Amino acid sequence: MLVPKRVKYRRVHRGHMRGEAKGGRTVAFGDYGLQSLENNWITNRQIEAARIAITRYMKRGGKVWIKIFPQKSYTSKGVGVRMGNGKGAPEGWVAPTKRGTIMFEVGGVSEAVAKEALRLAMHKLPVKAKIVSKAEASKEVNA
């Protein structure tokens, strides 16, 4: 599972998820990518589930690139704990993903296999997404 090796601060502010992604909008490594259409947090477990779905469908063929990393911790208080007394303990890790971000890329397989693998991964994620080719993604950024 993806987790940071070390962080400067264990607890971070929630922050805002407004607007579109500034970077990471092009398919850089593979031939096809999975592009987010919504702003949301994606947990390390969801990323891992999507990765497994892609690799199992491709059956050792091709290559997968994960373009998002869960670097932000989220906290929660225990059940039955009263309000106050500080922020809760770190619960897990999330990757804040904005609209337009390429989350996964695949290469080295046919178009049909790549699209089906990414479609399966889409169902594991909490955001609406679309499958884009290298040419489509670069056209959108330049427009």
Curated annotation (Swiss-Prot):
InterPro entries: Ribosomal_uL16, Ribosomal_uL16_bact-type, Ribosomal_uL16_CS, Ribosomal_uL16_dom, Ribosomal_uL16_sf
Alphabetic keyword roster: Ribonucleoprotein, Ribosomal protein, RNA-binding, rRNA-binding, tRNA-binding
Ribonucleoprotein keyword on record: yes
A GO biological-process term: translation
Gene3D superfamilies named among the record's database cross-references: Ribosomal protein L10e/L16 (3.90.1170.10)
GO molecular function: rRNA binding; structural constituent of ribosome; tRNA binding
Keyword Amino-acid biosynthesis found: no
GO CC annotations, alphabetized: cytosolic large ribosomal subunit
NCBIfam families in UniProt: rplP_bact
Summary of subunit composition and partner proteins: Part of the 50S ribosomal subunit.
Similarity comment: Belongs to the universal ribosomal protein uL16 family.
Function: Binds 23S rRNA and is also seen to make contacts with the A and possibly P site tRNAs.
Protein name, UniProt field: Large ribosomal subunit protein uL16
Gene: rplP
